[in-house]
Amino acid sequence: MDIRRIVLYMALALIGLSLWNAWQIDYPAAQPVEDKTASQLTSDGHLLPQIIPSNAEQPVTLKAEEKASSGKQLIQVKTDVLDVGIDLKNGDIVKGLLLDYPLSVEDKNKPFPLLQNQASQRYVANSSLFVLDGQTPQSLDFDFTSEKEYYELKPDQNQLIVTLNGKSEDGLDVKKEFVFTKGSYLIEVNYKIANTGNSLWKGYFNTQLLRSSPKEDKSSIFHIGSYTGASFSNPGKNRYQKVSFSDMSKSNLDVDAKGGWIAMQQHYFLSAWVPNADSENKFYTLATDKDYTIGAVSQPITVKPKEDKIVGSKLYIGPEITSVLKGISPSLDLTVDYGILWFLSSLLFSLMKAIYTVVGNWGWSIVLVTVLIKLAFYRLSATSYKSMASMRKLQPKLQALRERYGDDKAKISQATMELYKQEKVNPLGGCLPILIQIPVFIALYWVLLESVELRQAPFIFWINDLASADPYHVLPLIMGATMLIQQKLNPAPADPMQAKVMMFLPILFTGLFWNFPSGLVLYWIVNNTLSILQQWYITRKYSDEKPAKKVVATAK
């Protein structure tokens, strides 16, 4: 099999995958009917899981609260990086704006809304306490109050604590604290429980991330989509496990974990609840007709009369920055989803970042990383191009064999192999060097696709966002031209039909890259350009060696 066939098969596989993804979007699989015995939606919008209390043989289903939800009252908390809205009904975070990340290049003054509670799109971070009343679980309603409606972290402050005060009907005084830190997207959420009653209190601490189904991008059947869905980490068992929305619709997750984390992911951004490393929790997922939830429920919490207890968790609302996520919890950085080659992608990103600290431009960083990769594989590429040059020189002899034996494929094949042996040409010599490089190219591809640092990062001229498509589509056209030049340098395929297909590939890939992020297209342009120069140089050098020797021999 020669390199042309490999390229052709890879292109067809990529097209098939894109068409399949488009089909799945337009004709999704039928969703099973939700099992209402597994979960219930409370009147305040919380989904509560199925649990097994210590004194029960069968699971207990939490049922909806009978008390109607009161009108919403939000308090606003603003730091240097976050603008958060907290609903006083249950102390849920229902708004989360990322101040350092504009919505788009055109809307620089509008921060990106990671969390929101709109009718069309809901994505909130809930936390609550609930109890078991016999065999009937109930979510506690504290109707929190706060001293102010607006809190702001001052420039000279390193920390801001927002306290909500509430009281339950059974004599529980609760202070719900939110601790914000300067320059951080991590929020500490603590319940300070004081049992002012005369009997033992026993309950559970519940955290969850709830969002409605995201809208699919149908702008192109070749649209590249990053993973959007839930995930979790169960230390010692699953470092990083995805739970897609379709998985939630089919069955509910039920995992016992010590430490770990739960998360909702989307392209570039992440929300995650991170329990204490020594706490034991049950991770679960639930799905309704509109909403998907991943949550964590603690082991039973007991507070004796006249005693206090603190329970809590940490909530991350922010960008998927590898170095930041590593410091929060083990394996949380894996949500920067580089795929199966994550270890190689991590090395390449570290190299890109090191170059960026010097040049100060992510576009030039992409260019220089591509150059370094080409230099690292120079000898392998040279072997491949030398093999191609040898094959090109054999084309007249191969054509003569085809004309001599006509339709006798067996004789053509035998004569071709004898010719290869006689000329000391390995027809597979151009394939192996290319195959060795493919993992590196794939790893860099995912670095360019997943790194939030490239979001709205400018390059030069009209390219003001390396994570978005070229608005004038100049880069895809240049990329297509480089592919066409590369094909002209390669030996022509023996099969006329294959030759026509190969000539069509530059047009096909131009359309494929039409809406690709500019950073990805830039990488392919630089890579193709360097390949053209290297192939031209090696082919020219190799082709001129033997004629030069013949001239010298004749002169003698």
Swiss-Prot record:
- Primary role: Required for the insertion and/or proper folding and/or complex formation of integral membrane proteins into the membrane. Involved in integration of membrane proteins that insert both dependently and independently of the Sec translocase complex, as well as at least some lipoproteins. Aids folding of multispanning membrane proteins.
**Transmembrane portions of the chain:** 6-26, 332-352, 358-378, 428-448, 501-521
Pfam families, A to Z: 60KD_IMP, YidC_periplas
Q: Does the keyword Ribonucleoprotein apply?
A: no
Q: Which UniProt keywords apply?
A: Cell inner membrane, Cell membrane, Chaperone, Membrane, Protein transport, Transmembrane, Transmembrane helix, Transport
Gene from which the chain derives: yidC
- Membrane-protein topology: Multi-pass membrane protein
What protein is this chain from? Membrane protein insertase YidC
| Cell location | Cell inner membrane
Molecular function terms from GO:
membrane insertase activity
User: How the protein assembles, per its UniProt entry?
Assistant: Interacts with the Sec translocase complex via SecD. Specifically interacts with transmembrane segments of nascent integral membrane proteins during membrane integration.
CDD domains from the UniProt entry: 5TM_YidC_Alb3, EcYidC-like_peri
Q: Which GO terms describe its biological process?
A: protein insertion into membrane; protein transport
Protein family per UniProt: Belongs to the OXA1/ALB3/YidC family. Type 1 subfamily.
Record-linked InterPro entries:
Membr_insert_YidC, Membr_insert_YidC_N, YidC/ALB3/OXA1/COX18, YidC/Oxa/ALB_C, YidC_ALB_C, YidC_periplasmic_sf
One GO cellular component term, please give it.
plasma membrane
Domain of life, source organism: Bacteria
